[in-house]
Regions:
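C-terminal motif of bacterial Sec signal peptides marking the signal peptidase cleavage site
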Residues: 12-15
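Terminal non-domain segments
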Residues: 7-8
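Solvent-exposed hydroxyl-ligand-binding patches built from regularly spaced Ser/Thr
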Residues: 19-169
Length: 169
């Protein structure tokens, strides 16, 4: 059994060092909140503050009820795509970002496959949001960020400890 362990470890390391980004990202435990990320600022000590507008991401019957209440659809209809985002109060908040927080983005791989959940560091995510990534720095994938995207934030108190880009069909 001891001989298999180094072989398995070598295979895992080889897979991790290839040009393909990982397809799964393990998120920490915490409170999950939906929000639009409006921007990221660097504060004096070099840490980040994420500017968010919290929202509700609803699916199924709950989404249909909310959409009917807001006049988006008529009674008996269903929301397009199976989801509805409620953002009745547009209020910006500043939340601290744990520099070690994992970030899961929906990217397009260089081979053409899209909407692949891919993990990046919090620092790389901030650089991509701020447009600081030169061409070629993203090895193996492209992330098409446009506007203020919805995310699921994993919070520990007022600290963001994980971020998942919300997939929108």
């Amino acid at each position: 059994m001891r001989r298999i362990t180094p072989v398995v470890l070598a295979l895992l390391l080889a897979a991790c060092s290839s040009g393909s980004p990982p397809s799964t990202v393990r998120m920490p435990d915490g409170v999950r909140e939906h929000a639009y990320v409006m921007g990221v600022e660097t504060v004096d000590n070099g840490s980040y503050v994420v500017i968010v507008d919290r929202a509700q991401f609803l699916t199924g019957d709950e989404a249909n009820r909310a959409a009917v209440e807001e006049g988006f659809i008529n009674e008996g209809e269903t929301v397009p795509g199976g989801y509805y985002i409620v953002n009745d109060i547009s209020e910006l908040e500043e939340l601290r970002l744990d520099p070690g927080a994992p970030v899961a983005l929906n990217v397009c791989l260089d081979d053409g496959e899209c909407d692949v959940p891919t993990g990046v560091s919090a620092t790389l995510w901030v650089d991509m949001l701020n447009g600081d990534i030169p061409d070629g720095q993203l090895d193996g994938f492209k992330w098409y960020v446009g506007g203020n995207l919805p995310y699921t934030l994993i919070l520990n108190g007022e600290m963001i400890v994980g971020i998942e880009e919300q997939y929108l069909p």
